[in-house]
């Protein structure tokens, strides 16, 4: 299985980079992982709603240009479906069974995802009603994908 994570914004914190490197290494047993970092657009403090929409659209275009036609796109969005770790494991398994072996998880920037990206999405996933920094969320997503593969393979994992 091929898994791509498209994330808007540059990872700055060393401890997060170390965590991502660790989960990337762990995941290499189960899938081919590709992480794409896209440059985020600067959002002025006094940005209007219109300005924010323009910024989301610019970031959205970068995301859409990075998505290949054969990818099954899973957006991470507050309006998405919540799943347990076990349900995510089954979901990833079912994607493979249905021939969707190129999964693409999309993490938007600080303003979220554009309508165009949400329309391109095959599935929308929500981790929580809470808001997380998108840099930290990348680690959380990798951990859950790793956990999903462990569950799927009947291997021990922390409950």
Curated annotation (Swiss-Prot):
GO terms for molecular function: rRNA (pseudouridine-N3-)-methyltransferase activity. The keyword Cytoplasm applies. InterPro entries: Alpha/beta_knot_MTases, RlmH-like, tRNA_m1G_MTases_N. Keywords: Cytoplasm, Methyltransferase, rRNA processing, S-adenosyl-L-methionine, Transferase. Gene3D superfamilies: 3.40.1280.10. S-adenosyl-L-methionine binds at residues 76, 108, 127-132. Its main location: cytoplasm. Homodimer. Specifically methylates the pseudouridine at position 1915 (m3Psi1915) in 23S rRNA. This is Ribosomal RNA large subunit methyltransferase H. It comes from Clostridium botulinum (strain Eklund 17B / Type B).
């Amino acid at each position: 299985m091929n898994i791509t994570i498209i994330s808007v914004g540059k990872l700055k914190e060393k401890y997060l980079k170390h965590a991502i490197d660790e989960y990337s290494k762990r995941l290499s047993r189960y899938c081919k992982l590709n992480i794409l970092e896209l440059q985020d657009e600067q959002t002025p403090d006094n940005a209007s709603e219109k300005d924010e929409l323009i910024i989301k659209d610019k970031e959205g275009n970068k995301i859409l240009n990075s998505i290949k036609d054969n990818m099954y796109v899973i957006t991470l969005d507050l309006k998405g479906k919540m799943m347990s770790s076990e349900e995510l494991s089954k979901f990833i398994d079912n994607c493979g069974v249905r021939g969707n072996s190129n999964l693409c998880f999309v993490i938007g920037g600080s303003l979220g995802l554009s309508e165009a990206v949400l329309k391109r999405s095959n599935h929308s996933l929500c981790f929580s009603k809470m808001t997380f920094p998108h840099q930290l969320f990348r680690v959380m997503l990798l951990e859950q994908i790793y956990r999903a593969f462990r569950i799927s393979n009947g291997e021990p994992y922390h409950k």
